[in-house]
Amino acid sequence: MENIQEAVKQMFRRVGGWRVSLFVMLMAFMVTVVRGLVPWNTVSCLVAFEATYGFLAFVLGVVCLRNWRRTGFLLSHVGLLVVIVYGAIGSREIKRMKMTVGTEEVQSWASDYDHPERYSQPGFSILLNGFSISTHSSDISVFSQDGKEILRTVVTVNSPVEVDGWKICQMGYEEKVYEKEYEKEYGEEDSSEGGVFSKNYFSKLQLVRDPWQPCALLGITMLFFGGLWLLVTTLLRARKDLHGSSLYVFSSLAITLFIAVCMFYPPLWRKQLMPVLRSPWFAPHIALYIYCYAVLTTATIMAVGQFFFRDMKRREVWQKMVDLFVGIGIAVMTLGMLIGAIWAKDAWGLYWSWDAKETWAAATWLLYLFFLHARKGKRIAYPWAAGLLTLALCCLQMCWWGVNYLPSAQESLHVYDV
């Protein structure tokens, strides 16, 4: 019996050790990159993905048990564990369908999101009363199965409506033009062709049913406060450990990059945005991401630039600055990503759907987390650390704009002209 207990303890020490943790983070990064590169529709790829994240959840659970007294540590790690468990268990119970509704007849059938050839009934039907192009809003009536109107409401982008556990989200619209025989009765005359036409609008809705969303919200909340904890503790450590002049130069470069990107980033300055971008979450999400991009880019530049110094003490100061600012960058990135998840729920009914953009955001986040854990205790040294940051910066660029050119982004909800 004692031998069994000792073997279990030894297994927990190894599984919760830094080597296994780094290995599983690297594996999770690799399968996430593969998912972000190609359309994800093969069973073998899905099994590999779920197995890797299942092992990551197991390692996280062991690590949390070994560090249960550390408040800030538990907030972030238990939060991530809850999110992964939600993704593994809850995702199988998520129902996601598309429905196109018009003004002429009540629609009661919807197609499966992943398998458009499959149709089913959500338990109610919808009739479109009117559609506003400027706001992408639909005036709809919802009917029960016996034909009784149970709700009349307006569905707008970023403001879904809930009916019988289903969230009805506004996704877009379709305009169809019909040629009519009689001008007075059916429409307007087209002077170029000499025919008579009538326009009809169809609203594209997404129906989402996710009974596990409270579990996801719990994990997101814990991760959010864990990210805040990491940000505050890293800032305090930076103030204590770094020289004033070096910190001033480093911070000035990061802030300059932040301002430059803000000045030349079109969505921040165009007066007319797409309806999905007209959200109170837009400004904080974009600002946090641009700031973390600026900080992490600066960290990469200085990680490479420190090799030009012959003075080893100065190199060590710069390396310490790089480590601290990567900590700040990953904390801010975590906050921005979680705000984006909340925004996604408002817009599309789900916190996370492994959209191409979301997949690359997760891959970038995992690689910077790998760097953060690998540099703790200097488990990897330079120049390996500089090479890792360079690779992470490439992933960051792919997440920002490169993903738009990938085959996996053809159906992405994040690819749009702002």
Q: In which residue ranges do the predicted regions lie?
A:
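Solvent-exposed, non-transmembrane regions of integral membrane proteins
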Residues: M1-V418
